[in-house]
């Protein structure tokens, strides 16, 4: 119920167009033009975030970094190569297939996306909130929306037993909070993953990483004053079903 108090403040802080192995599927299901627009929209989002941080002059630990999806299994290399070829179809030179990465791991292959980014999600959330307020916007925390209706050409938002009427409503929650259309509540489930931050006392790598095989583990570095720490996140599973 607070800014960055839940999922938004607990992400890995990666800002990337590389959503796993996805573009090969997207081209097959939606076509090259749709996939190109998807890639361009994500790239524009990275640039917009960078611009907002520059304008607000807030320290959000923003850094341009390359992003990698890698595998240690030879049987998955072909999948990565097909993904790289698919990305090449919509933007030549955006990605490349490589056999070595800066991580101290032996790998079978990886796809690298150039000039992606990482940041501190909570610092950015606060900077964004400040920018909204500075532009005469208002933010209300602890204000749970329970329903949205269309009445007399307006939207009526029900909040904490009160109503707000608006010409336009933008829903930017992690998943839609309205049941119709979509019935998303019938399709969703809770999942759990784990994060570790460690001071490994060594010079750390550049870049952001996630492996293709299951379980997925994500790696990146984070700033802590003069130190760089290792952040590892992964072992996602359906809550209440599996044992670690």
Model regions and ranges:
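Glycine-rich FAD pyrophosphate-binding loop
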Residues: 1-10
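N-terminal FAD cofactor-binding segment of flavoenzymes
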Residues: 9, 13, 40-48
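N-terminal glycine-rich dinucleotide-binding loop that anchors FAD/FMN and/or NAD(P) in oxidoreductases
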Residues: 12-37
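Flavin (FAD/FMN) cofactor-binding and adjacent substrate-gating region
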Residues: 21-28, 48-127
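Short, histidine-centered active-site or binding-site loop motifs used for metal coordination
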Residues: 30, 115, 234-238
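Active-site substrate-recognition segment that forms the wall
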Residues: 47, 55-63, 145-147, 163-244
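Helical element adjacent to the flavin cofactor pocket in flavoenzyme catalytic cores
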Residues: 78, 85-89, 110-168, 172
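General beta-strand structural signal in soluble alpha/beta enzymes
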Residues: 95-99, 139-141, 159, 171, ...
């Amino acid at each position: 119920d607070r800014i960055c108090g839940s999922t938004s403040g607990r992400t890995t802080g990666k800002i990337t167009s590389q959503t796993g192995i996805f573009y090969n599927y997207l081209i097959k299901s939606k076509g090259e033009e749709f996939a190109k627009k998807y890639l361009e929209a994500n790239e524009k989002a990275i640039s917009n975030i960078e611009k907002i941080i520059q304008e607000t002059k807030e320290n959000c630990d923003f850094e341009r970094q390359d992003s990698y999806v890698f595998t240690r299994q030879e049987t998955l290399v072909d999948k990565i190569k097909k993904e790289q070829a698919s990305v090449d179809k919509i933007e030549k030179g955006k990605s490349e297939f490589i056999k070595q990465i800066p991580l101290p791991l032996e790998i079978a292959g990886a796809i690298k996306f150039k000039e992606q980014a990482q940041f501190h999600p909570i610092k950015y959330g606060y900077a964004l909130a400040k920018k909204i307020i500075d532009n005469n916007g208002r933010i209300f925390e602890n204000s749970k929306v329970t329903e949205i209706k269309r009445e007399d050409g307006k939207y009526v938002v029900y909040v904490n037993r009160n109503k707000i009427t608006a010409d336009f409503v933008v829903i930017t929650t992690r998943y839609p909070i309205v049941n119709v259309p979509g019935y998303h509540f019938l399709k969703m489930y809770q999942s759990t993953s784990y994060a570790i931050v460690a001071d490994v006392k060594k010079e750390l790598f550049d870049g952001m990483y996630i492996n293709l095989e299951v379980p997925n583990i994500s790696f990146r570095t984070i700033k802590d004053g003069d130190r760089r720490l290792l952040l590892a996140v992964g072992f996602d599973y359906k809550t209440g079903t599996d044992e670690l």
